[in-house]
Amino acid sequence: MINDVSRAQIAIWDKLSNISVSKKIGSAYLFTGPIGSGKETLALKFSQLINCENSLKEICYECSSCIKFRALQHERLNIVVPLPTPKSASSDGIFPKEYFESIIAKSEDPFYKIAIPKANRILIQSIRALKKKLYFKYEKDSGRNIVVIFDCELLCSGQGESGNALLKLLEEPPDRTTIILVTDHKKMLFETIISRCQNIEIPTLSNEYVYNWLIENNSSNSEAEFLVMICRANIHRARTLSRQPVEKLINQIEKLATTVVSKDSEKWRNFISHYSRLFGTNHLDFNHHLNLITIWMHGVNKLKQGLNSGFENTGLQPRMISFNKKFPKANIFEVILCIEDVKKHARQNLYMPLILLNMLIDIQKFVYE
């Protein structure tokens, strides 16, 4: 199965399998690496393996534990994700219906990215509820409690109270408990958290794996080749880009690129208004559209350096050539950094209209001056 990321990350899976066989399972691991490299899937599979009733080396997929883990419904599995701020400080009722829907979606598609609207941080209430559950005594004293924390850098958002609460768990973990933190942004974590975890560095997926995944998920050969070129080994990006026809995707890229280099104040107002609202309701779509601008800029920069843009057989190639002729001194590298800064500020929950305005102003400076 192409969805089995352990086949794409053989060296990492062998390392995790050896940990299971040794029975020297740590109390805390930190899975880090590039976006879309399969970290979440590997964390869940490792959790399934160390609770498998029939094997220490490979997941059997047949025992009751494996079946429950595959459905993400095992009583010893605790999945922590960013959630919207609740109306009260109590840990009761903090999970919106989108959380449960997302868990089901994740069980059906390992590359599904959980992104609940208005969920900007990991709540202190989630960590408090977790502590209560981890100290619960099971009648059947087998298996291991597993905590998997996705987007764990958001433990440290705001005043970092959730990160500090988790730190106490890491310092004095309950018996037979393993906490797996998963992040694309290791540098945003407290050093005290990092130092208490065994680091598992996940490399990027191969282009061959992403290509085969796209083919298995109904992309044509030409579409898969094009998407592999622009998704940069990010399986989440490949998944998102493959949801729409390539022609529509190309038109969207051109429209966004034209807007951010435009001097039309009305286009600016519409852009800032639309994407500020989108940021508040759907972080994944917000990042997706920023990525489309970055894709355009990377193509322009490659042409500038005499390389293939990846858009040779599309209508974007002539427009990119025209862009380079019109703006021969444009600093494309700095433009890309401007867009990446917006994504970084988005993770810090800063005021988005001002962030987007500053981005547009900076892009003008690096393109026109």
Q: What annotation goes with each model-predicted range?
A:
Residues 132, 168, 195:
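Conserved adenine-binding aromatic site and its adjacent loop/helix in ATP-hydrolyzing domains
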Residues 125, 129, 142, 161-165, ...:
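Residues forming well-ordered secondary-structure scaffolds
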